[in-house]
Amino acid sequence: MPAKAASAAASKKNSAPKSAVSKKVAKKGAPAAAAKPTKVVKVTKRKAYTRPQFRRPHTYRRPATVKPSSNVSAIKNKWDAFRIIRYPLTTDKAMKKIEENNTLTFIVDSRANKTEIKKAIRKLYQVKTVKVNTLIRPDGLKKAYIRLSASYDALDTANKMGLV
């Protein structure tokens, strides 16, 4: 402890004459030397984190720029009537529906809805449909029962398709 006190006293003695010398120079010399700019360092107070987990603060994220694709070609619509209607069913139950209920039975794409199925049948076989019933079979395929209007015969349409 006494060593620290002695060094502090020595530094006070040394600093006093320097300040006195600098005051004399400032009085005699140019006033520009006295008005020397001092460098100011600003210290911002940091927030103390009181939570046990550190959460990174949000920083600026530049919005993404859309890059033009190098392969600029016309996108082809792969969802057409031939993709929607896969194939007709020729089981005994399907044949009975053709004869008694004027209904055709098809396996269709599992993502197709009833209106798309109706439009595809109209395009492929040129017949009007009254309604479309669909079900998903246990094997994952979608079956569609297409009831034709009274002006069209399901048996004639099946003959044109080559079912009967």
From Swiss-Prot:
GO BP term (any one): translation
Gene3D superfamilies (UniProt xref): 3.30.70.330
Keywords per UniProt: Ribonucleoprotein, Ribosomal protein, RNA-binding, rRNA-binding
GO molecular function, one term: rRNA binding
Family matches, as InterPro entries: Nucleotide-bd_a/b_plait_sf (IPR012677), Ribosomal_uL23 (IPR019985), Ribosomal_uL23-like (IPR013025), Ribosomal_uL23/eL15/eS24_sf (IPR012678), Ribosomal_uL23_CS (IPR001014)
Gene Ontology CC terms: ribonucleoprotein complex; ribosome
Start and end residues of each stretch annotated as Disordered: 1-41
Family stated for the protein in its record: Belongs to the universal ribosomal protein uL23 family.
Function: This protein binds to a specific region on the 26S rRNA.
Name listed for the protein in its UniProt record: Large ribosomal subunit protein uL23
Lineage: Eukaryota, Discoba, Euglenozoa, Kinetoplastea, Metakinetoplastina
